[in-house]
Amino acid sequence: LNVTQHAIVTPEMVQQIDAFHRNTQDLAGLIIKPMLDYYYNFYSKSNPGIGGSPMHDFVTIWYLLNPDAVRLSKVPIKVIPDQGEGFGQSIADFRFVTNPGYKTHNIAFQFNYERFKRDIMETFLRKRL
């Protein structure tokens, strides 16, 4: 989730999207602002000073459409499935000699935020039939 934490939709972007859907009277589009406001409020409490709503799922789907805009590395990873302090956390092993019990996965380290932002805005500011 570290990379997806940076896939931010800012309040200014949300206002622009909402104004567009109000002007076009797009009822489906009008659900976007309340949804993103909900996430922004949640993340503002858990991460004060965050600049907007992280779009974890959006950036994951966006990556499938734009694999050239994301930098990946193959890294041995273990997910902690057991209850306790590490529950749900992923441990990436960056050492040269790794634990053979860790499976290797692709991890995203960087993505083209400006391109992501442009694509999000082009998608949400498109008039539907």
Q: Model segments located where?
A:
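N-terminal acidic, glycine/proline-rich low-complexity segments
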Residues: 1-129
